[in-house]
Amino acid sequence: MDRSLGWQGNSVPEDRTEAGIKRFLEDTTDDGELSKFVKDFSGNASCHPPEAKTWASRPQVPEPRPQAPDLYDDDLEFRPPSRPQSSDNQQYFCAPAPLSPSARPRSPWGKLDPYDSSEDDKEYVGFATLPNQVHRKSVKKGFDFTLMVAGESGLGKSTLVNSLFLTDLYRDRKLLGAEERIMQTVEITKHAVDIEEKGVRLRLTIVDTPGFGDAVNNTECWKPVAEYIDQQFEQYFRDESGLNRKNIQDNRVHCCLYFISPFGHGLRPLDVEFMKALHQRVNIVPILAKADTLTPPEVDHKKRKIREEIEHFGIKIYQFPDCDSDEDEDFKLQDQALKESIPFAVIGSNTVVEARGRRVRGRLYPWGIVEVENPGHCDFVKLRTMLVRTHMQDLKDVTRETHYENYRAQCIQSMTRLVVKERNRNKLTRESGTDFPIPAVPPGTDPETEKLIREKDEELRRMQEMLHKIQKQMKENY
C-alpha cells in the first residue's frame, strides 16, 4: 500500500460492504487516512461506525457531539484536540464542567467563599465578607459595658440589676444598720462579672453609689459621683495619650440608671440637682422604681409629670436615635414604644413563683402575683430590650463621641491655655532683660573675687544689650 498517495489508487478499499470496511479499518493504523476515509464516505448509507452491532437498526439521527466545557470558551487555542480512536470500543471523554456559583459550597454566613472563586464569577471580589470579618474579630475580643445605678436606698437597685442580667452581683454585700447609716457618706463601689451567652462574652461592670440621698443634709451629695466619672475619663485620656495604646481598658461609665422614688409627686430637688450635674457627663435613663406600689392610672400620671419636669428644668436625658428609613415597621413600632415608656416603671424580683401553672419571676401578694417579665405589669422587658438588645452599642457610641469628646476638648483647651500663658510669661521675661539672672555677691568674699564677679556682671549686661539691639534691628528689617 502506497501511503504517500493518501487515499488515491489502491488505498481505497474495493469491498465497501460492512465486513470489508471493518477489515480495512483493522489493517489501517494511520489516523490521517482514517479521518479522510470517514469524511469521504460519511454520506454512504452502508458506512456505519463500528461501535455496536445493532447500529443499523437505529434511526439515522446524528448523535450530538459532547460539548467542550465552558472552561475553554475564553481561550480557544488551549482546547484539547479530539481525535477518533481506531478501535471498536470508540468512546469520547470530556472533563466535568466547573461548579456554578449556586452549586459551590457556601460560607457559614450564606456568602460565596472569596477564596474559592472560579472563572464563571470572576467579577466577585470578596469585600462583601468584611462584616463577617468584623463580627469574628469582635466576638473573639469580647465586649465591655459599664452601668451605674444611682438613687436612694430601698428602691430596688440591686434587685433590678440581678434581674436584668440573671446573675447575683451582690452576694458579698453587707447591709449597714441604722446607726451606721447616720454617719455614712456617699461611696463608689464596683462589681465586675463576665457573662457569656451563645459564644458572646460580655464583661459587665456595675458601679453602685451606696449612701446617696440617705443623709439628712444631702447638699452636693452628687459630687463624688461626678468626680468618679471624670476620673474614668481622665484615666482613659492618659492611656490614650500614652505610648502603649494596645490594651487600653475602657472603664468609662456608659449609662446611668437613676431611680426615682414612687412616693413623691414628681421629681424632688435632689433628683433635679443630680441629673443637671451629670447630664453632660453620662447617659441618664430615669427609672420609676417600685411600680408595683402604684395603680396603672397612677403610673401614667407620674410618668407624664416626670417628663414635663425634665423638660422644664432643661435636663438632657438619653435620647433614642431616630430609625433609618430602611428599617422594618416592627422595629419602628418597637422603638416608638420605648420612647413613650420613659421613665421606665419597673419591678425587680429574684424569686420564682407559680402563676397559672407555670413558674415565673415575680412577687406574690395576697391579692395576686406581679410578674416581672409581663409587659402588662411593668416596663421591665422594655428596659432590658433597650439596655441590652437594641441600644447598648449606641450608649457606648454616645459616650465616646459626645461625653468623652467634650471632656477631651476641655482638657486640650486647658492645656493650650497653660502653654500660651507660659509662652507669654517667657516672652515678657526676655524683653525685661532678666533672661540670665545675676546672682548676688555672696558675703565674706575677698576684694579680688568681688572685682572679678562685677566684671563678669558688666560683661553679661553688655551681651544682653547687644542681643536686644540685634533683635530690634531684625524686627525693623522684617
From Swiss-Prot:
Compositionally skewed regions (Low complexity) per UniProt: 95-108
Modification Phosphoserine occurs at: 117-118, 325, 432
Cell membrane among keywords: no
Chain positions found as Phosphothreonine: 434
Chain intervals with Basic and acidic residues compositional bias: 13-26
Region (G4 motif): 289-292
Biological process annotations from GO: apoptotic process; cytoskeleton-dependent cytokinesis; flagellated sperm motility; hematopoietic stem cell homeostasis; neuron migration; positive regulation of apoptotic process; positive regulation of intrinsic apoptotic signaling pathway; positive regulation of protein ubiquitination
Record-level Gene Ontology MF annotations: GTP binding; GTPase activity; identical protein binding; magnesium ion binding; molecular adaptor activity; structural molecule activity
The organism's place on the tree of life at top rank: Eukaryota
Chain residue ranges for the region called G3 motif: 208-211
UniProt region (Disordered), positions on chain: 1-115, 428-448
Distribution of this protein across tissues and organs: Widely expressed in adult and fetal tissues with highest expression in adult brain (at protein level), heart, liver and adrenal gland and fetal heart, kidney, liver and lung. Expressed in presynaptic terminals of dopaminergic neurons projecting from the substantia nigra pars compacta to the striatum (at protein level). Expressed in axonal varicosities in dopaminergic nerve terminals (at protein level). Expressed in the putamen and in the adjacent cerebral cortex (at protein level). Expressed in colonic crypts (at protein level). Also expressed in colorectal cancers and malignant melanomas.
PTM: Phosphorylated by DYRK1A.
Septin-type G domain: residues covered: 141-414
InterPro entries: G_SEPTIN_dom, P-loop_NTPase, Septin
Complex formation: Septins polymerize into heterooligomeric protein complexes that form filaments, and can associate with cellular membranes, actin filaments and microtubules. GTPase activity is required for filament formation. Interacts with SEPTIN8. Component of a septin core octameric complex consisting of SEPTIN12, SEPTIN7, SEPTIN6 and SEPTIN2 or SEPTIN4 in the order 12-7-6-2-2-6-7-12 or 12-7-6-4-4-6-7-12. Interacts with SEPTIN14 (via C-terminus). Interacts with DYRK1A.
Further remarks about this protein from its record: Colocalizes with alpha-synuclein in Lewy bodies in the substantia nigra pars compacta of Parkinson disease patients. Shows reduced expression in dopaminergic nerve terminals of the striatum in sporadic Parkinson disease.
Role summary: Filament-forming cytoskeletal GTPase. Pro-apoptotic protein involved in LGR5-positive intestinal stem cell and Paneth cell expansion in the intestines, via its interaction with XIAP. May also play a role in the regulation of cell fate in the intestine. Positive regulator of apoptosis involved in hematopoietic stem cell homeostasis; via its interaction with XIAP. Negative regulator of repair and hair follicle regeneration in response to injury, due to inhibition of hair follicle stem cell proliferation, potentially via its interaction with XIAP.
Protein name from the UniProt record: Septin-4
Naturally occurring in which organism (per UniProt): Homo sapiens
Lineage: Eukaryota, Metazoa, Chordata, Craniata, Vertebrata
Gene name of the record: SEPTIN4
